[in-house]
Amino acid sequence: MKQPTAEQIQEWIDDAHDDIESQKRRLKEGFREKHNLTLEGFFWARGIYYFDIALGHAMLGDRPQAEEALTESIRYLALPYRMAYDEGCEHRDQAAPPEKNGTIGIPQTNSLLLAMAALDNDEINAELIPFVQLAESDEKDQEFMEMVQTIRALQVMLSRGEDSLSASILKTALDHSKSHPIKGAGWRRRTYTINLTLWSVLQRQQETFDEALNLFLKDYETESRGENRDLAFAYASLEAVGMIKLARRYGLKYEGDHPLIPAALL
């Protein structure tokens, strides 16, 4: 896939900064109250803007600015969880019910945890992981069971918990994938490759890790050729960066040079 130019990447960064400033103005003008919008939605959107900024700087090779923007992104994306579950959160009195605010669902939680893995900051993980959790109804969601298990495993791994627990969680997901065949591309196939990659990390299996990561990247690149091709995340995968960072904790290596993996964040 043709890579974006430096000018295009800088335009994405500038647009995201403009969106942040526009959002701040609307908040001051009472736009949220006028249209009965949740505060969580504004925090989540700002987190996505910083996410795009982080990807842009990473693609341009600017590690300090990429890490700074990724940190801001994670903190804003985590705010809806703090509003829901952290009694000490200053915005808790404005929180919508977790199952109604639309910002802490299963895919969002999965993406946030993988972004935290990409940042690889134990201090931030210790601060936020206790609150980055699913609503009870999502915990019991059988349709998305494989991704729920990904979330549970990542919570343990990022907290530096027991490897045996993470492995057991991932085995449950992988066994489910095998007994319920995956047909074609989509979230189930992507989740399977993530679970297989994380499993290989815990087992310290370098060859399986390489194969699973390559499968993930191949699928990611295929999906990026579609409607996402004009967006920053089509050209850089924080999920892949996060899995590589976790692999390094367990003594595994990544020696590739894939265009979807920005070296500035490794």
PLM features: residue spans?
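Alpha-helical oligomerization segments
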Residues: R204-L266
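Eukaryote-skewed repeat-based solenoidal scaffolds used as protein-protein interaction platforms
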Residues: Q3-L217
